[in-house]
Amino acid sequence: MSSCACNTGIKIIYSCSGAADVGELADRAVRQLRKEGIAQGSCIAAIGADLSGYVQSAKGADMTIAIDGCPVGCTKLNLEKIGVTPVAINLADLGFKKGESAFSESLLASAVDGIKRVLSGDKAETAVNVNTSGSGCGCGGNC
């Protein structure tokens, strides 16, 4: 007998890990948020490589969060490519500038705080995308 994970509140967070300073900042912020239990982490490169287990996990999550370092938005674009519309947070929108955000613990704390504010709804432009298929398992609500 299979067990459905519908409506279990599964949140998965993905990050940019680009070569730019803001990519490193996004990656480290996501690692910190994961440690704090904000969401489970997963691999955006596996999404880009179309690895089925990773794709199904992203599609089945109740909330998918994309943290990008710069306006290119690779994390968000990779998720959209597989049909997932994530809660998208771009560090550029939080005031971090590419080429001017060399990693430091204080910048990390600011990035983590900004991401938490957006996720909690403190920023008006936040559009939280919750899976509306009726479930979090990707079955379409038929279980």
PLM regions: where:
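Iron-sulfur-associated redox domains of electron-transfer enzymes in respiratory
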Residues: 1-140
